[in-house]
């Protein structure tokens, strides 16, 4: 086992000197080379279920409603948890790679996969009873039946997520983003004809769309596994050390639970937003408009999400390597990219505010309402990009617990109450609800900015070093 690097920087360079030295420019190139492919990977992964929803929706309004309801429920109750838990691997695998503890990267990945499987079993039990659960919550029985059947056929896809999500973090920690991109694009191209065949050629309707998702994600698992198994790039890192297995599982949950809380609390807030919109006057209009805003914000988020993944990787690698100065510069580089992308996309959205609604609806009322909410949506673009980058810093550094507490305070103690008050008491309706989202994001951004500015980078690097050299892999 190779010994991790000792701390290599006696003193951190002041920010002013960092800018003058050109370190930020160098790091910008490195962060960008990771961020662009990761954004494309995220888009491709996002499109897989979207394509199935689109194909299934052409079978009728009932099918579309049922599939949309099932997609929302399964995202909240299952997929969000697995994606959240994977944040632990950004800390552990990234720091292990920086510390040249290559065999730990594979062991962490195997441990995460093994930990995900029993979680998927529990989630599957819930999904089996989705139809009855939705009916008990007052949903239309026909829509609930379609949603329940669709969710049932998504269970294999859930188990596929237990494998491919750790594999993607395994590759990301090593900076192997281009192979990851090629595998993801191959899966997307595979999914399109498979989805069409299951829905139309085999006549399986909405169930066929769910089956296609499951088949495609397992195809994704197979090609990712083949790359990891046979690529020379993974010779050192695919090793499994059985003696570290139990301690790696403990570390995975130590960082994974707060990481999952970070993700789930944010995902759940937006589902709560849609539910609240159904209680407003003219619920069809309010729900439609807020769904359009949410979809637009989600599509934009893949860009700062890619930057966040890149920053997380660079921060974790450099902390593990004992080079805190470069870790700090990575944060500055990520924020530079955020400034550029948020300025561009918020300006583009505002310029297109009067036509963006037509991409989703032909109703003039809906289009005008979306245009009215666009300034708030632009603010969301700016704040979401900022918080995404700083959440990436949190995952790379290993302080997910702070991020989770921050989300509770920002969204549930501030944002949600403000949104409900403005929507119902001040009668701002959907605009009021989205104001609550913006306020919550602003509070989240302020707290994250304060925490990030207060980071003792040498101390974080020392924690990463101790985590890697600990003979028993005890929790840091």
Swiss-Prot record:
Q: What is its main location?
A: membrane
**Can you cite a GO biological process for this protein?**
xenobiotic detoxification by transmembrane export across the plasma membrane
Q: Identify this protein by name.
A: Protein DETOXIFICATION 3
GO CC, any one term: membrane
Q: Does the keyword DNA-binding apply?
A: no
- Tell me the membrane topology, using the record's own terms: Multi-pass membrane protein
Transmembrane annotation, as ranges? 35-55, 66-86, 117-137, 146-166, 185-205, 208-228, 260-280, 289-309, 331-351, 370-390, 402-422, 433-453
């Amino acid at each position: 086992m190779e010994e991790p690097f000792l701390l290599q920087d006696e003193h951190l360079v002041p920010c002013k000197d960092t800018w003058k030295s050109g370190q930020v420019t160098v790091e910008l190139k490195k962060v960008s080379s990771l961020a662009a492919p990761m954004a494309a990977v995220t888009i491709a992964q996002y499109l897989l279920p979207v394509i199935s929803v689109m194909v299934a929706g052409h079978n009728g309004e009932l099918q579309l409603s049922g599939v949309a309801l099932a997609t929302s429920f399964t995202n909240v109750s299952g997929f969000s948890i697995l994606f959240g838990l994977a944040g632990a691997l950004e800390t552990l695998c990234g720091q292990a790679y920086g510390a040249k503890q290559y065999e730990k990267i594979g062991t962490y990945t195997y441990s995460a996969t093994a930990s995900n499987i029993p979680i998927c079993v529990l989630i599957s039990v819930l999904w089996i009873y989705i139809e009855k659960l939705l009916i008990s919550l007052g949903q239309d029985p026909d829509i609930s039946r379609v949603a329940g059947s669709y969710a049932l056929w998504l269970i294999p896809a859930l188990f596929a997520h237990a494998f491919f999500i750790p594999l993607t973090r395994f590759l990301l920690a090593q900076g192997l983003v281009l192979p990851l991109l090629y595998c993801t694009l191959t899966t997307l191209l595979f999914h399109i004809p498979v989805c069409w065949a299951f829905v139309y050629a085999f006549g399986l309707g909405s169930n066929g769309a769910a089956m296609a998702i499951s088949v495609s994600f397992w195809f994704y698992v197979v090609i990712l596994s083949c790359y990891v198994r046979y690529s020379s790039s993974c010779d050192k890192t695919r090793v499994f050390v059985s003696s570290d297995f139990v301690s790696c599982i403990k570390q995975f949950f130590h960082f994974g639970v707060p990481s999952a809380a970070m993700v789930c609390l944010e995902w759940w807030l937006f589902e709560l937003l849609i539910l609240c919109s159904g209680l407003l006057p003219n619920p069809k209009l309010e729900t439609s408009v807020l769904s359009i805003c949410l979809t637009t914000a989600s599509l934009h988020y893949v860009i700062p999400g890619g930057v966040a993944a890149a920053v997380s990787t660079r921060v974790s690698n450099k902390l593990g390597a004992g080079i805190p100065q470069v870790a700090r510069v990575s944060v500055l580089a990520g924020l530079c990219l955020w400034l550029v992308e948020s300025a561009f996309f918020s300006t583009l959205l505002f310029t297109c505010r009067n036509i963006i609604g037509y991409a989703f609806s032909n109703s003039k009322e809906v289009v005008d309402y979306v245009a009215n909410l666009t300034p708030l949506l632009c603010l969301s673009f700016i704040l979401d990009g900022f918080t995404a980058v700083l959440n990436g810093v949190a995952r790379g550094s290993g302080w997910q617990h702070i991020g989770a507490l921050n989300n509770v305070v920002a969204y549930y103690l501030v944002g949600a109450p403000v949104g409900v008050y403005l929507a119902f008491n001040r009668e701002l309706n959907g605009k009021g609800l989205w104001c609550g989202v913006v306020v919550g994001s602003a509070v989240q951004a302020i707290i994250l900015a304060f925490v990030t500015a207060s980071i003792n980078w040498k101390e974080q690097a020392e924690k990463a070093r101790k985590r890697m050299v600990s003979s028993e892999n005890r929790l840091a």
